[in-house]
From Swiss-Prot:
Any GO BP annotation: DNA-templated transcription
Recorded superkingdom: Bacteria
Region: Alpha C-terminal domain (alpha-CTD), residue numbers: 248-336
Listed name of the protein: DNA-directed RNA polymerase subunit alpha
UniProt remark on domains: The alpha-NTD is essential for RNAP assembly and basal transcription, whereas the alpha-CTD is involved in interaction with transcriptional regulators and with upstream promoter elements. The alpha-NTD recognizes upstream AT-rich elements and the alpha-CTD interacts with the transcriptional activator Fis in reconstitution assays in E.coli.
UniProt-listed HAMAP family: RNApol_bact_RpoA
Location of region: Alpha N-terminal domain (alpha-NTD): 1-232
Keyword Transcription attached: yes
One Pfam family linked to the record: RNA_pol_A_CTD
Gene3D superfamilies given in the database record: 5' to 3' exonuclease, C-terminal subdomain, DNA-directed RNA polymerase, insert domain, RNA polymerase, RBP11-like subunit
Species assigned in the record: Rhizobium meliloti (strain 1021) (Ensifer meliloti)
Protein role: DNA-dependent RNA polymerase catalyzes the transcription of DNA into RNA using the four ribonucleoside triphosphates as substrates.
Gene of this entry: rpoA
GO terms, molecular function: DNA binding; DNA-directed RNA polymerase activity; protein dimerization activity
């Protein structure tokens, strides 16, 4: 069966997120098949840094400034430094259309991202970020163009041919994810000691949580990889269909050693080669009492346990035992 290629690989039964504020989070996923920690960690990291959409300033116009190599009277930073500071403004914006936002301030004092006047669907996430410093009597007015996008776009690609004089294009850092690191360690699952444990640390600008960022990255990978799947998935039976096909109570597939029986009773059943409840209920009381070392006390104990399950000795199960009893027992173990 082709589906065993992926169905029999172990999947993490422990996926935990620990958040430190809105900007930092740690993911722990274990166990993974050996080698999958590195495979998934590296793939998620690359997608997180390159492919998630965010908002950034794409251009700025400063009153009285014609190009980025100018200086502004009364402003301590030159325009080049101001542009570098503008690149670090963290923004969350809804919609895909370009938006404008403005800042106007008089000195003395510091101009921060929190001084920017925004429209309703734009949020400044780092309002204390310094843009420039004004001396006494100085005044500055800046108008920013904001867009949504992904990855890194250099200033040259943000320069339009019909741009007005004085509009300075800015390198756009759209990615909401600022840092990602991961490590892979050994972990244990049952008797296997060399499964992988993946730990990822994510830092964002606050426009998206670390947990959501990983979910988006995983969805991107899922969507990209789906084009390589050249076959239809085998259809899974619904629980109702599966139960209908089974000609007997799924509880009969439960092993008798899972019942809470005394050691004496359990040993007697084992010695009589009674493995499943389906084997047990087809025995009569007389047959059970002929079992070596099996007495009336053990019989009453078993009758009580079966009664609690709606079963009794001496029942007839025409299709018992099924040919694939072990597979059926695994398939229906959550139904008894």
């Amino acid at each position: 069966m082709i589906q065993k290629n992926w169905q029999e690989l172990i999947k993490p039964n422990k996926v935990e997120f620990a958040s430190s504020g809105r900007t930092k989070a740690t993911l722990v996923a274990e166990p993974l098949e050996r080698g999958f920690g590195l495979t998934l960690g590296n793939a998620l990291r690359r997608v997180l840094l390159s492919s998630l959409r965010g908002a950034a300033v794409t251009a700025v116009q400063i009153d009285g400034v014609l190009h980025e190599f100018s200086s502004i009277p009364g402003v301590r930073e030159d325009v080049t430094d101001i542009v570098l500071n503008i690149k670090e403004i963290a923004i969350k914006m809804d919609g895909d259309d370009a938006k404008r936002m403005v800042v106007r301030k008089q000195g003395p004092g510091v101009v921060t991202a929190g001084d920017i006047q925004t429209v309703g669907d734009i949020e400044i996430l780092n309002p204390n970020h310094v843009i420039c410093t004004l001396d006494e009597g100085a005044e500055i007015r800046m108008e920013f163009t904001v867009n949504n996008g992904k990855g890194y776009v250099p200033a040259d690609r943000n320069r339009s041919e019909d741009a007005p004089i004085g509009l300075i294009p800015v390198d756009s850092l759209y990615s909401p994810v600022k840092k990602v690191s991961y490590k892979v360690e050994n972990t244990r699952e049952g008797q296997v000691l060399d499964y992988d444990k993946l730990t990822m640390s994510i830092e964002t600008d606050g426009s998206v949580t670390g947990e959501d960022a990983i979910a988006f990255a995983a969805r991107i990978l899922q969507d990209q990889l789906s084009v390589f799947v050249n076959f239809d998935e085998p259809q899974k039976e619904t629980e109702e269909e599966a139960v209908t096909e089974l000609a007997f109570n799924p509880a009969l597939l439960k092993k008798v050693d899972e019942l809470e029986l005394s050691v004496r009773s359990a040993n007697c059943l084992k010695n009589d080669n009674i493995v499943y409840i389906g084997d047990l209920i087809q025995k009569t009381e007389a047959e059970m009492l002929r079992t070596p070392n099996f007495g009336r006390k053990s019989l009453n104990e078993i009758k009580e346990v079966l009664a609690s399950m709606g079963l009794h000795l001496g029942m007839e199960v025409p299709s018992w035992p099924p040919e694939n009893i072990e597979d059926l027992a695994k398939r229906y173990e959550d139904q008894y």
